[in-house]
Regions:
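A general structural signal marking secondary-structure boundaries and capping sites
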Residues: 47, 59, 91-95, 124
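Electrostatic cytochrome c docking/interface patches
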Residues: 27-47
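C-terminal capping alpha-helices of c-type cytochrome domains
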Residues: 87, 93, 105-124
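Extended, non-globular alpha-helical segments
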Residues: 2-13, 83-102
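N-terminal export/targeting leaders of redox proteins
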Residues: 1-34
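Gly/Gly-Pro-rich "capping" loops immediately C-terminal to redox-active cysteine motifs
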Residues: 37, 45, 53-89, 105
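Cys/His-enriched microdomains
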Residues: 50
Length: 124
């Protein structure tokens, strides 16, 4: 009986440790995600990098363009985040007549910058 109690206590301790570690890693992941979104926003509004606001209407955008579609409800438009990334990387794959710059194909942005940009745009 005492052996069973010790086993149960050990299992409960292990479960508590694992649960605590998961909660801490979830909080760290959320903080990292928020940081990535902020980095992506800086790229989207940066006049020397992504400069999305030149062609797209976006929240917080000053003097937004209207050449491209407004960047709203992006999770509804792109439920698959990978497809949004592919569109930013090379929009001419989906539409050869696209006026949008192929940011990845032409190496306008690095892969990491594209990831940040996708995180931001997908959050809109």
């Amino acid at each position: 009986m005492i052996k069973e109690i010790k086993s149960l206590a050990a299992a409960a301790s292990t479960l508590a440790l694992v649960s605590g570690a998961l909660l801490m890693s979830s909080a760290a992941y959320a903080a990292e995600g928020a940081g990535n979104i902020e980095k992506g926003k800086a790229i989207a509004f940066g006049r020397t990098q992504g400069n999305c606001v030149t062609c797209h209407t976006m929240d917080d955008g000053e003097s937004p363009g209207n050449l491209g579609p407004p960047l709203i409800a992006m999770k509804a438009r792109y439920p698959d985040k990978a497809k949004l990334r592919a569109q930013i990387w090379d929009p001419t794959v989906a539409n050869p007549e696209s006026a949008m710059v192929p940011f990845g194909k032409y190496k306008v942005l690095t892969e990491e910058e594209i990831d940040y940009l996708v995180d931001y745009i997908w959050s809109l």
